[in-house]
């Protein structure tokens, strides 16, 4: 193979195949909170199928299970609101406008 054609060939990098997020023995059910909570974001949203790396059927079952768990109060609709701690107030001296009389 001449040098001009060799430049366009991509090197084959080896990659490690990840394990599927749902094993064959896992049962997708609204009562299985430990499994369901893996597919919910920090904000409490259901993660997309691309992020979860699930099949279409698995994603549908996960979505239904999450919604059922929310209705039955096993999962919250919204995560707990984080309280912001107020720091001690400091006097603001820079940038204050003074009124001309």
From Swiss-Prot:
Record key words, sorted: Chloroplast, Plastid, Ribonucleoprotein, Ribosomal protein, RNA-binding, rRNA-binding
Entry GO terms, CC: chloroplast; mitochondrial small ribosomal subunit
Protein name per the record: Small ribosomal subunit protein bS18c
Main location: plastid
Gene: rps18
Family as reported in the entry's similarity comment: Belongs to the bacterial ribosomal protein bS18 family.
UniProt cross-references to InterPro entries, sorted A to Z: Ribosomal_bS18, Ribosomal_bS18_sf
Cellular localisation: Plastid, Chloroplast
Single Gene Ontology BP annotation: translation
Assembly and interaction partners: Part of the 30S ribosomal subunit.
Matching HAMAP family: Ribosomal_bS18 (MF_00270)
GO molecular function, one term: small ribosomal subunit rRNA binding
Lineage top rank: taxon: Eukaryota
């Amino acid at each position: 193979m001449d040098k001009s054609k060799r430049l366009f060939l991509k090197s084959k990098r080896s990659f490690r195949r990840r394990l599927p997020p749902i094993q064959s023995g896992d049962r997708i059910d609204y009562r299985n909170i430990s499994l369901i909570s893996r597919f919910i974001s920090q904000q409490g949203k259901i993660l997309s199928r691309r992020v979860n790396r699930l099949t279409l059927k698995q994603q549908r079952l996960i979505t239904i299970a999450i919604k059922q768990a929310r209705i039955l109060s096993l999962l919250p609709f919204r995560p707990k609101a984080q309280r912001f701690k107020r720091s001690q107030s400091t006097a603001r001296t820079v940038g204050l406008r003074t009124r001309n009389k």
